[in-house]
């Protein structure tokens, strides 16, 4: 490209000769681009700009609504005008007057703000490529300038999933903190849904032999420091021996999947329904029917035990309340008698009190009545 072309490109004699020839440049410094074919070249290797759905985004659809932007020394705006002989790249010089190419609120304004949001152009290193142009041949046609931008720093690389460990085979000391909490939750759910009240009490005694459980207690908190490798081994053995044989064993993976599908680990009925759905999806219809029936039998047995225990608790509470009321009435009567005796002693009116006892025989009952009014 000749020296004259560079001079005309970098320091034109008239400010923005391109605008004076083709566009209607008004006093408000707006640009009528109805005669122009403006194209904004998207940056390659830029993942956040995939929403443009193409490698080039045609701005002629915006009409006269184009974004407000000021080109810095590092950023060039590529504008192709009609025939290629009149193509110029606008370079913003600090001495030149800045003007609004694109008013705010337009589609292109959103594009400009998106570009400025994802990258700091002043800190980026660009590798300018001129495809289709031959500088050595002296061609004065500038093709689309495509900056090579580093990949966005906001993209996070996917983490490699940790290898799965079967907690049913690990000793307590080999588990991490999170694995211990997860396994305790799994055991609590399994014991509370599959076993009766007596089995639950036995497991609690294995974990903490000194635990005291009152009839009014509805839950038991398991401390992590109470468990050891030997206690966990005993608990696993007890669960294998006393778990219902007709009911398929719930593995830890199935429990985790059921909890994720329900979104909560608090509902026993929700867990039972999700487990039943998993059994029906992985086995035949006959096997699923048998497992569901055994599940219902086991659950009914557990519900019966819980109902009996609840009734005993209500009766004990009722008897305790009645006993407290009787003790309160007796204490109140004793205090009243003591208060009355103290008043009589202080008044001195009953110092010469004589108590007479009257005894009526049966013979006198048959005597004639005496009329006291006579």
UniProtKB/Swiss-Prot annotation:
Q: Keywords in UniProt for this one?
A: Coiled coil
UniProt xrefs under InterPro entries:
FAM199X_fam
- This protein's superkingdom? Eukaryota
Annotated Basic residues bias: 315-334
Q: Which Pfam family, any one of them, does this sequence belong to?
A: FAM199X
Coiled-coil regions, chain positions: 317-346
* Amino acid composition bias (Low complexity), ranges on this chain: 261-295
Region ranges (Disordered): 238-343
What PANTHER family has UniProt attached to this entry? PROTEIN FAM199X
Q: Which family does it belong to?
A: Belongs to the FAM199 family.
Q: What is this protein called?
A: Protein FAM199X
């Amino acid at each position: 490209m000749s020296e004259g072309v560079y001079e005309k490109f970098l320091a034109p004699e008239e400010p923005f000769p391109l605008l004076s020839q083709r566009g209607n440049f008004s006093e408000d410094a707006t640009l009528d681009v109805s005669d122009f074919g403006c194209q904004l070249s998207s940056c390659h290797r830029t993942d956040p700009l995939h929403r443009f759905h193409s490698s080039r985004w045609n701005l002629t659809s915006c009409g006269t609504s184009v974004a407000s932007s000021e080109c810095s020394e590092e950023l060039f705006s590529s504008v192709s005008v009609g025939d290629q002989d009149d193509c110029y790249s606008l370079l913003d010089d600090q001495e030149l007057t800045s003007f609004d190419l694109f008013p705010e609120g337009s589609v292109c304004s959103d594009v400009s703000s998106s570009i400025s949001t994802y990258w700091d152009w002043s800190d980026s290193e660009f590798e300018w490529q001129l495809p289709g142009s031959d500088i050595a041949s002296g061609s004065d046609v500038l093709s689309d300038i495509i900056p090579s931008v580093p990949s966005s720093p906001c993209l996070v690389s996917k983490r490699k999933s940790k290898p799965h460990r079967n907690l049913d085979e690990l000793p307590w000391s080999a588990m991490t903190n999170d694995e211990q909490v997860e396994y305790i939750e799994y055991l609590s759910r399994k014991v509370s849904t599959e076993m009766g009240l007596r089995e639950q009490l036995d497991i609690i005694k294995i974990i903490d032999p000194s635990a005291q459980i009152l009839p009014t207690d509805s839950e038991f908190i398991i401390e992590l420091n109470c468990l050891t490798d030997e206690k966990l081994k005993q608990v696993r053995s007890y669960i294998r021996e006393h778990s219902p044989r007709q009911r398929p064993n719930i593995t830890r993976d199935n429990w985790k999947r059921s909890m994720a599908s329900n979104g909560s680990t608090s509902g026993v009925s929700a867990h039972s329904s999700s487990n039943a759905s998993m059994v029906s999806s992985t086995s035949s219809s006959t096997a699923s029917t048998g497992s569901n029936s055994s599940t219902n039998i086991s659950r009914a047995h557990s519900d019966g035990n819980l109902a009996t225990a609840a009734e005993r608790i209500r009766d004990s509470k009722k008897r305790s309340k009645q006993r407290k009321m009787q003790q309160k009435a007796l204490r109140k009567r004793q205090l009243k008698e003591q208060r009355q005796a103290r008043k009589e002693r202080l008044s001195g009116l009953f110092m010469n009190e004589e108590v007479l006892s009257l005894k009526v025989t049966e013979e006198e009952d048959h005597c004639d009545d005496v009329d006291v009014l006579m």
